Amino acid sequence: MTLQCTKSAGHWRVVVWDEEGFQGRRHEFTAECPSVLDLGFETVRSLKVLSGAWVGFEHAGFQGQQYVLERGDYPGWDAWGGNTAYPAERLTSFRPVACANHRDSRLTIFEQENFLGRKGELSDDYPSLQAMGWDGTEVGSFHVQSGAWVCSQFPGYRGFQYVLESDHHSGDYKHFREWGSHAHTFQVQSVRRIQQ
């Protein structure tokens, strides 16, 4: 069973700038933004998350690489993408992560796509799935019972990030194609809960 999250208006705030170091033009968001281009920005190069958790995307329309943005300052691309294998130096669209709940998050991982094969139940952060006993470097599918999670391609939360939420796809992610437009492999080796 997937638990539905409660969305509250005004719970999210992020301020973005078009230059690194919190310089240049700025804009504040309290809701999703499919394209900063519509606001006259070419890109976002620094930001401050004031409340809530957000996911930033490399391209407009919530496409491309995903970056989890939790409360704090991001003075440049290396602050949000320094752990990834292929960092994007800009962000072009944003949306809040509605179901982030660090204390009550549950995720089931499956060995194969379509919820087949061996499975594991998670309710904590795992910097290495192999260290917790998961065989191999791949996860075929996910079912998010509650909360929001970020899965990473490599141990230590490095590599491509995939945001999984209980209120998207009814919490069911049957194949890597549902993890995001940039997903091209089943390789997932670390998983953590997203914090509000």
UniProtKB/Swiss-Prot annotation:
PROSITE patterns noted in UniProt: CRYSTALLIN_BETA_GAMMA
Cystine crosslinks: none
UniProtKB keywords: Acetylation, Eye lens protein, Repeat
InterPro entries: Beta/Gamma-Crystallin (IPR050252), Beta/gamma_crystallin (IPR001064), G_crystallin-like (IPR011024)
Pfam families: Crystall
Keyword flag Acetylation: yes
Modified residues (N-acetylthreonine): 2
Record flagged with keyword Repeat: yes
Region (N-terminal arm): 2-11
One GO molecular-function entry: identical protein binding
One of the protein's GO biological processes: visual perception
Domain Beta/gamma crystallin 'Greek key': 12-51, 52-98, 105-146, 147-195
Region (Connecting peptide): 99-104
Domain commentary: Has a two-domain beta-structure, folded into four very similar Greek key motifs.
Job description of the protein: Crystallins are the dominant structural components of the vertebrate eye lens.
Subunit text: Homo/heterodimer, or complexes of higher-order. The structure of beta-crystallin oligomers seems to be stabilized through interactions between the N-terminal arms.
Family that this chain belongs to: Belongs to the beta/gamma-crystallin family.
PANTHER family: BETA-CRYSTALLIN A4, BETA/GAMMA CRYSTALLIN
Protein name: Beta-crystallin A4
Organism: Rattus norvegicus
